[in-house]
């Protein structure tokens, strides 16, 4: 993870003590999301972290393929550095996110709303 994504990860971890997180650093399975979460409803989910300076959110072809193959319980959390806004997107909209960037409507906006959504996510 890049330096800004590492800081973002620590911010998420601090704000979600009720979620058990596993940080995934895997160079052999390209495209695997950054985080595996386990919430209070006994559900597993993955989160890809992105930090951006502008409207564009960039992904590797492997990351796009992962989210296309795994459309459920996969998420992308994006932090815009200038505004400090945090948005959560479902993995199944990754192609739209690539095309539209942060103009795409998120399923949740704001760090607290994003974290709360993941905490109470059900199957």
Model-found features: residue ranges?
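Acidic-basic catalytic patches of nuclease active cores, encompassing PD-(D/E)XK
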Residues: 1-26, 40
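Structural signal for conserved beta-strand scaffold positions within catalytic alpha/beta enzyme cores
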Residues: 23, 48, 76-78
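Beta-rich catalytic cores
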Residues: 31
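Conserved catalytic cores of phosphodiester-cleaving nucleases, focusing on short active-site segments
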Residues: 35-37, 43-53
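Short strand-connecting beta-turns/loops that link adjacent beta-strands
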Residues: 40-42, 81-82
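Mg2+/Mn2+-dependent nuclease catalytic core
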Residues: 52-70
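Nucleic-acid nuclease catalytic cores
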Residues: 68-96
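Charged phosphate-binding loop/patch that engages nucleotide di/tri-phosphates or the phosphate backbone
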Residues: 101-123
């Amino acid at each position: 993870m890049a330096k800004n994504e590492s800081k973002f990860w620590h911010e998420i971890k601090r704000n979600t003590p009720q979620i058990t997180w596993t940080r995934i650093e895997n160079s052999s399975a390209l495209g695997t999301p950054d985080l595996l979460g386990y919430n209070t409803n006994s559900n597993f989910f993955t989160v890809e972290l992105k930090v951006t300076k502008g409207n564009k959110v960039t992904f590797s072809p492997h990351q796009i393929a992962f989210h296309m193959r795994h459309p459920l319980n996969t998420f992308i959390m994006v932090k815009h550095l200038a505004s400090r806004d945090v948005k959560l997107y479902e993995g199944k909209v990754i192609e739209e996110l690539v095309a539209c960037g942060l103009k795409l409507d998120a399923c949740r906006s704001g760090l607290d709303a994003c974290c709360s959504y993941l905490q109470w996510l059900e199957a």
